[in-house]
A protein has these predicted regions:
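Conserved short beta-strand elements that form part of the metal-binding/catalytic scaffold
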Residues: 28-61, 106-111
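Short hydrophobic/aromatic beta-strand element in the GNAT-like acyltransferase core
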Residues: 40, 48, 64, 84, ...
Length: 114
């Protein structure tokens, strides 16, 4: 069995408010709105994040994205008024930061060493 797609779910209390925030995070509107409770962004050919209205579990997500240029990613966030935590270096030189959405869901963003 081969995994061909990954959809990383992010439970939120208010889908419409979350869509606005994630539009700023990603820099564009959702690629897919399958129903009134979900909205999804395609980040890679086979990797997606999606928000889903689920107030009982809102704030419980922890996902990780790896980018090729963390500094450029952070500059884009700053332009779109999205706050990120401090950048730390972990392991064998992976630089990471954490972005937390209004519900408390955490998105760790890292750049592996060159």
């Amino acid at each position: 069995m081969a995994v061909t797609y990954v959809f990383a779910g992010i439970p939120v209390a208010d889908r419409d408010a979350a869509v606005g925030w994630y539009e700023r995070l990603v820099g564009r509107p959702p690629d897919l709105i399958p129903n009134d409770d979900e909205a999804a962004w395609r980040l890679t050919e086979t990797g997606w994040i999606y928000v889903i209205a689920d107030a009982a579990r809102a704030g419980s997500a922890l996902n990780t994205l790896l980018v090729d240029d963390l500094d450029a990613f952070l500059a884009g966030l700053a332009e779109r008024k999205v706050m990120a935590g401090p950048v730390k270096t972990i392991g064998d030189g992976v630089r990471v930061t954490v972005v937390t959405d209004p519900d408390g869901n955490r998105l760790q963003v890292g750049q592996p060493p060159a």
